[in-house]
């Protein structure tokens, strides 16, 4: 079965290299969009990916690992995710799975790499899979490329740390998101 294109909240295909807000598919108490935050309740480095409780968050861009046709993002294909923002940290805005201060387990952090060039770069590969709600999707970590088995394949969900910061972590459950083009 051929993979299906990922679509935004307007039903249009999501494209590589275009800015999107990634927002909770559940409105209201489900929280807002994705942004970055430091350890504890600080906005300092290092940074992890968090869900803003109210706003649309920061713009995100998807990058293909392999050459793609028509620039369309498809379900269950390895890709890189990065924030299209400037940060005052000595790390990239690309996502990766890593340990993070104050969080037990694997956390979605910044400092990732683009493309595939060895085991370490697979920590920056995510897939987008269809979820249950209309136009909703989940992020999944399970690179198709040769990798170390140190980090298990799993979905991305929200974890409330002791400061009630909504951090993205790997878990069996999955947070459902929708994609909203920033310049609709």
Swiss-Prot record:
Q: Which GO terms describe its cellular component?
A: extracellular region
**Mind listing the UniProt keywords for this protein, alphabetically?**
Disulfide bond, Glycoprotein, Protease inhibitor, Secreted, Serine protease inhibitor
Q: Which Cys pairs are S-S linked?
A: 45-89, 142-153
Q: Give yes or no: UniProt keyword Cell cycle.
A: no
Residues in coiled coil: none
Subcellular localization: Secreted, Extracellular space
Glycosites:
84, 90
UniProt cross-references to SMART domains, sorted A to Z = STI
Superkingdom of this protein's organism = Eukaryota
Gene3D superfamilies (UniProt xref): 2.80.10.50
The terms under GO molecular function for this entry are: serine-type endopeptidase inhibitor activity
The entry assigns this protein to a family as follows: Belongs to the protease inhibitor I3 (leguminous Kunitz-type inhibitor) family.
Q: What is this protein called?
A: Latex serine proteinase inhibitor
């Amino acid at each position: 079965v051929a993979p299906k294109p990922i679509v935004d909240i307007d039903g249009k295909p999501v494209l590589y290299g275009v800015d999107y807000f990634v927002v909770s598919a559940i409105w209201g108490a489900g929280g807002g969009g994705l942004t970055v935050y430091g350890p504890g309740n600080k906005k300092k480095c290092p940074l992890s990916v968090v869900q803003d409780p109210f706003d649309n968050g920061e713009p995100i861009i998807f990058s293909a690992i392999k050459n793609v046709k028509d620039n369309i993002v498809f379900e269950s294909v390895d890709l890189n995710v990065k924030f299209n923002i400037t940060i005052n940290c000595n790390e990239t805005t690309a996502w990766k799975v890593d340990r993070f201060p104050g969080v037990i387990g694997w956390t979605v952090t910044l400092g990732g790499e683009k493309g595939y060039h060895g085991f370490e770069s697979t920590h920056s590969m995510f897939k987008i899979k269809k979820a249950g709600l209309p136009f909703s999707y989940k992020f999944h970590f399970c690179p198709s490329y040769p990798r170390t088995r140190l980090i298990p394949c799993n979905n991305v969900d929200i974890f409330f740390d002791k400061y009630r910061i909504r951090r993205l972590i790997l878990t069996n459950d999955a947070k459902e998101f929708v994609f909203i083009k920033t310049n609709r």
